[in-house]
Amino acid sequence: MRRVLAVDGHSMFYAQQKVGWFFEPRNLLELAAEGAELSSAFWYAGLKDPSDQRPFRDALTNLGYTVRTRPLRELGGSGGSDSARGHSDQRQSDQRQYVRANLDVEIAIDLLTVAPRTDQVWLLSGSRDLDRLVEVLRAQGLQITLISTEGMVARELRNAADRFIDLASLRPRLEKGEAQQQPVFSRT
């Protein structure tokens, strides 16, 4: 069994916040390699600037991940040009909003490229935009395991996969020891 691992870093960051713990990328690689030959591991991340997350990205590369990045799209908060109205550039920069980098195309290209030499894909994402990719990979005979968490995964993506594993069920195997926190969306 040849397996490929693809981690949508943006989606997983928010899924991990929701469950209240963060996974260790090394543990994820070890889990993905159990019972299979892990032929490729990809990690996708949006960046505010080229130096953003540099130590983390370097650590991922050293572990064996292929790291793909794109700049986060930046939107102004006021909709107009503050400098044209005499406001300082500092105020304008304070109102910047960053939104998703959208690495779905990179995920699709990588997974379609490795598909001929792959039997199984572990996809860590919740993006509805990947449902058609999953359908195409399955039509090519690949088995797709989707890993995310309840409430953070699109129904269409979950329905397209062969198997769904809730990230919460993997906590004993994946959790980073020093990164425990309370769930962001706890119900009391």
What spans do the regions from the language model cover?
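Terminal and domain-boundary accessory regions
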Residues: 1-188
